[in-house]
Amino acid sequence: PSGKVVAIIKEKKGKLWLNFYNTETKENNRSELLYFTKVLDMSYSPDGTKLVFSAVQKGQSDIYVFNIRGRNYDQVTNDIYDDLYPHFTDAGNKIVFSSNRSNDTVGVDVKRNRPQNNFDLFLLDTYNRQQVLTRITSTPEDETQAIPMDSIHIAYLSDKNGVVNRIV
């Protein structure tokens, strides 16, 4: 968030590396990400102390919060649904993301709750850590790549008209 340190995911020879590059000192600090097969997307928390990832582990994509100082992570979703494009809200206590989940509960029985063919937006409270998410959209179209604009508005991509548009 300060613009001084850039976080970069690098894939090299089958391994994943998280690089922090300081633009002022030109220093590069890297750590191997052993737990993940692939990191699909990531973004900083507003205070710059955490990263939120959409990452693949054992063939499923879930949301993880990485503590930069401690170099540890916390898995916040763990189910068969595709959880993509996570971003912290401007207060940093919630995460907005896209998912093909058919309900608003984390870790539900797959036999009764099959994944949808489209992506909706969901909000996850990182402090209360309840198993229930807040569903933001519920449409037959895809809503993806949500970015919180402020404490009320979220911009996202939607293919509602057959063409992908940015909606606020």
Where are these regions (language model features)?
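Generic detector of contiguous secondary-structure segments
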Residues: 70-93, 151-153
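A flexible loop/linker signature enriched in serine peptidases of the S9 family
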Residues: 1, 7-19, 32-39, 52-64, ...
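Surface-exposed loop/turn elements that mediate protein-protein interactions on large endomembrane-trafficking
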Residues: 21-28
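Short coil/turn segments that connect the beta-strands within blades of beta-propeller domains
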Residues: 2-4, 47-49, 91-93, 151-152
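Secondary-structure-rich domain cores
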Residues: 26, 68-71, 130-131
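Alpha-helix C-terminal capping segments
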Residues: 21, 65-67, 148-149
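Conserved beta-strand position repeated across blades of beta-propeller domains
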Residues: 43-45, 87, 147-148
